[in-house]
């Protein structure tokens, strides 16, 4: 397990804020919902939405999981998992989730086959009228992030992730998202300038 330190120490991102604001203003009675958050970061989503909901989270960063554990929030379950790697993930929760939040729906390290398997799993585990929500800025990547060696008196030498300026490249285009919605028989909402929302029919 990699102990890179990055997102758990960052302030809330605009992407997270957009999604939380959207859910608070567009979801009917945002209570008693089952929510899956993919890539929990600093657990901002859990902090804001957990009061009346149950949230599961997965992450590839042990530091993010350790930070989430220290919050000691009830109804918040989280574990180390690569969303592309385990296709048996959540086999016991078919048609279970009302909402899946995945800010970076696809990454450069993911092939088309793995992405399609992952998204097919998402569709299986959301219930009817369930939503898969992603950020438009998460559809493209404009920075290079890689581990660098750092030092602190607490941790001595350790690896953390650092952003470097890089070229803008689309991981998924809006057209790709529209094609995905047709392929998996989902409704797609592009009315929000910051988000893409898929809904299971």
Regions from the PLM with identified roles:
Residues 1-28, 41-52, 58-75, 80-86, ...:
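Class I (Rossmann-like) S-adenosyl-L-methionine-dependent methyltransferase catalytic domain
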Residues 32-41:
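Conserved class I S-adenosyl-L-methionine
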Residues 102-105:
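A short beta-strand submotif of the Rossmann-like class I SAM-dependent methyltransferase core
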Residues 108-121:
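A short, conserved alpha-helix within the catalytic core of class I
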């Amino acid at each position: 397990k990699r102990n890179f330190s990055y997102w758990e120490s960052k302030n809330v991102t605009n992407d997270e804020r957009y999604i939380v604001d959207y859910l608070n203003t567009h979801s009917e009675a945002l209570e008693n919902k089952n929510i899956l958050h993919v890539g929990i970061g600093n657990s901002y989503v859990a902090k804001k939405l957990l009061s009346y909901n149950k949230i599961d989270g997965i992450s590839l960063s042990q530091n993010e999981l350790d930070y989430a554990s220290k919050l000691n929030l009830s109804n918040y379950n989280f574990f180390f998992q690569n969303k592309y790697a385990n296709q048996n993930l959540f086999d016991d929760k078919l048609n279970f989730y009302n909402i899946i939040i995945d800010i970076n729906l696809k990454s450069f390290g993911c092939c088309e086959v793995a992405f399609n398997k992952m998204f097919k799993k998402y569709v299986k585990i959301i219930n009817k009228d369930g939503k898969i929500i992603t950020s438009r800025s998460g559809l493209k990547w404009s920075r290079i992030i890689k581990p660098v060696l750092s030092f602190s008196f607490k941790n001595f030498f350790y690896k953390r992730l650092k952003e470097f300026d890089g070229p803008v490249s689309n991981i998924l285009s809006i057209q790709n998202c529209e094609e995905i919605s047709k392929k998996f028989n989902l409704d797609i909402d592009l009315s929000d300038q910051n988000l893409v929302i898929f809904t299971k029919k």
